[in-house]
């Protein structure tokens, strides 16, 4: 609500595991919520039926209230062995027919499935990519906020390796104006990754085609 009042169009991205515990979100829905069921297989988790049941219960209620819900299967060419099972579980909650789109399906009003190619998540233990030019929307169009209030450049930093500050201690303006945050922003403006973790992220390579 505060974001809307300040003129922002809030979009949240989540793996959906905590949505059933955050029902108050239904009373202050953002413009869009992007939920990533592909993370379930990628993180080697079990009980997909329980997970999808919780995700779809929330998704359908949020969509009915006008929030755009996008269920993302961004794992083509990678951890996608469970995709068919996940689609079948989704269909139990929102039966076909679905309207086919170039990047997935429209299941119902405000409810979509989107598929795309898999990219490598950043891993500080891996070697850096040898790429002369990269780009990322981190701190430009998006930030990540972990469950404890830690702000990171994007949602791929799930361990908080690039912690920029905590919203329970600092304002977002203070966090984004910090020297480290500004260095990351300027780096991607110049098509370079200044942080080691970003140098090991496959998305910064994929997204360079969107650079601006």
List the model feature ranges, each with a label.
Residues 30-32, 140, 162:
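Structural motif
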Residues 21-24, 132-133, 188-191:
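Short, flexible, glycine/charge-rich loop motifs used to bind or transfer phosphoryl groups or to couple energy/partner
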Residues 19, 136, 164-167:
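Short clusters of hydrophobic/aromatic residues that line enzyme substrate/ligand-binding pockets
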Residues 156-212:
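Flexible mid-to-C-terminal extensions adjoining Fe-S/redox cofactors in radical SAM and related proteins
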Residues 1-102:
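Radical SAM/AdoMet-radical enzyme domain recognition
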Residues 61-154, 159, 193-208:
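A C-terminal junction/extension of Radical SAM enzymes
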